[in-house]
Structures are given as structure tokens and as C-alpha cells.
Amino acid sequence: DQVTSDLAGAAGRIALERAGLQPDDLDRIIVATDTPDYLSPATAAVTQAKLGASHAGVFDLNTACAGWVTALDVAAKTIVTEPEERFVLVIGAYGMSRFLDWGDKKTVTLFADGAGAVVVGAGSQPGWLATVTAAAGEYHDALGIYTGGTYRPATTANLAQYGPPHVQFVRKFPATFNTERWPPLIERLLAKASAAAGTPLRLDDV
């Protein structure tokens, strides 16, 4: 019966313990999830309360499967640009079992529940070198949970017509989607990281 904030809190406590920190040492908590406890308030606020991290500012971030790495990027840039913020707790939490149609083999074999967390802070050695981001918004209607938001509220009529909120594949992605989209991103990232590191980086260095 664990909800997303329970998973996030458990991962956050482990990360704090391994970092040798207390909840009140945190300046910010970012929870990356597309399965929040509620539409509002933020799951990060619920997690803050469960951790007892009363000093930390909080927000959720939703970029679906890319959520955790996006949150990590935001945290790293926060540490660089906000010197008074020393520690940011980044949590990726997934409670997708609540949104599965157990008769749909396309989704039940892909999605599950879990959480992971890290504490991001300044260090004496170079850490986060570079980020590149991209999105294919034209496929927003291909895979997702389409009931429960403002587009299709969870009204009695919509639930009767579409059923409860479930993750679903609506249409296929092109077979060449990954092979066409990823290599240019990797090349851009290596170029950007090379500039930040002051030395050329190649795939063999990764």
C-alpha cells in the first residue's frame, strides 16, 4: 500500500544516511515523478514532511522517463548558481503499479514501482560537466496517462467512457526513433562536455 511519497521518503532517508547528513541540512528537495500522490500539492511537499526536512524548499518535476536525470541537471545547476544552497536532495520515484491495466501485456511488462535518491552538493573536483536536452512533443499522445488532468478530467462521464486512469500505448513510435534521435544528442553532449572539461572527450572515454 505504499504511495509515491513513501517510496521517495525511503530513498531519501538512505541517501541522507550515506551522505552523513540530517534532514535539516537540506536546502531543496526535487521529486521527479509522473505518478504523484495528488495532482496538488506536490509530492515533494509530502516527502519533505515525511523526512522532517523543514528547512528545504520543494518542487516536483515531471518529464516522464527522463525525470530523474532532468532533476539531477536542475540540482547541479542550482548548486552552481545559488552558492547559499549547499545540499539538494534529488529523488526519482515511480508508483506506476497504481496506473496499470493488468490485462494489457504491453504495459504491465514495462512499468513497476521504485525510487532512487542522491544528495547533490559542491565539491573540490569537477562533477557535472554538461547537459543536453530534447523532446519529441509531437508524440505526446502516443504513450501516457490521459485521464485525470484538465484535458480529460476524472468525471463520472469520462470514467464511464474511458475507464480509470491507466498508462497506455495509443500509437506506435517509428521503428527508427531511437537510432535517429540519440546519436546527434550524444555528439552534442560530448562537444559540450569537452568544452567544460577543457579536453576532448570521445565515446571511448565514457
Can you describe what each PLM-predicted range is?
Residues D1-Q2, D104-E180, P184-A191:
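Condensing-enzyme catalytic core mediating Claisen C-C bond formation in acyl metabolism
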Residues Q2-D6, T33-F87:
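Conserved catalytic cysteine-centered active-site region
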Residues A11-D27, L185-D205:
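Phosphate/pyrophosphate-binding loops at sites that engage ATP/ADP/AMP, CoA/4′-phosphopantetheine
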Residues A15, L26-I29, T47, A71, ...:
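Buried hydrophobic positions in well-ordered alpha/beta secondary-structure cores of metabolic enzymes
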Residues D24-A32, F59-N62, E85-A93, L129-V132, ...:
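Beta-strand segments within the central parallel beta-sheet cores of soluble alpha/beta enzyme folds
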Residues Y38-G52, V90-M96, T150, A154-A160:
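Acidic-glycine-rich active-site phosphate/pyrophosphate-binding loop
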Residues Y38-S40, G67-V69, M96-L100, G137-H140:
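Short, well-ordered, mixed-charge alpha-helical segments that flank or form enzyme active sites
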Residues T78-A115:
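Flexible, glycine-rich active-site loops centered on histidine and acidic residues
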